[in-house]
Structure formats: structure tokens, C-alpha cells
Amino acid sequence: MSFCVKEEDGTLLRSGEYLEDALREFDNSKIDSFLINCAPPEAIHSSINVMQSFSKPFGALPNAFVTVNDLDIYNDVSILKKRSDLNIHKFVGEMLSYIKNNASIVGGCCEVGPQYIEALKNEIFNN
């Protein structure tokens, strides 16, 4: 099961509820894993901290948008812009940090292209 968290606080869902409460609802269910998606990598660190206290495997698929908060107003993805500061090296570093904190599922969401995933794969398998 995947959740979207606030950009400013990865412990809160975009709708305002606590991530921890949502995870608790499904921790004893047949759901295989917990994921965070469509949030900036920096916000997901606090989500990873929350997910570590539950029994299911977990991970994250961050996006590379400047912000998705504008969707709350305009509800139109065409207004979203790609970040210029999230290069491949920084993305891979963020993913390795998640893995170091026990995430077993990592990848990318919007604006994270194949070259990012290829670099992540190479880093995981070559080190």
C-alpha cells in the first residue's frame, strides 16, 4: 500500500492525517508492504523513520518535482515543474540513505527517469 505525504512534514499524509495512524490500520492486514510515493526525497526521511516501527517491508518512490502543493489549488499536473537540484548523484544518495534505514523497496515517481534508476541499480549491485 502506498501513501502520499506532505512535502513539509513526511509524518503527515497530504490529507493531514498522521502516517503512523494510517500504517497502524493496515499493519495486521494482508497488505505486503508500505510505500511512500510522489513526495520529495527530503520529506521521505521522516516517513522512513515512522515506517521502521511497523512489521511490514517498506520503501519509497520519491518524485523530482519542485512542488506538488500546487495540485491542491489547480488540480492540473501540467503546472508541475522538474527540480533542477535533484541530479542523479543526489537521488542515488537519498535512496542509499533509505536502504541504510532498512527500506527494501526503492525507486522513483514522476520526473525520476530511467537514468536515475540505472544509476541506483549500478550503485546497489556494484557496492
Each PLM stretch: what is its role?
Residues 1-127:
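Domain-level signal for soluble alpha/beta catalytic cores
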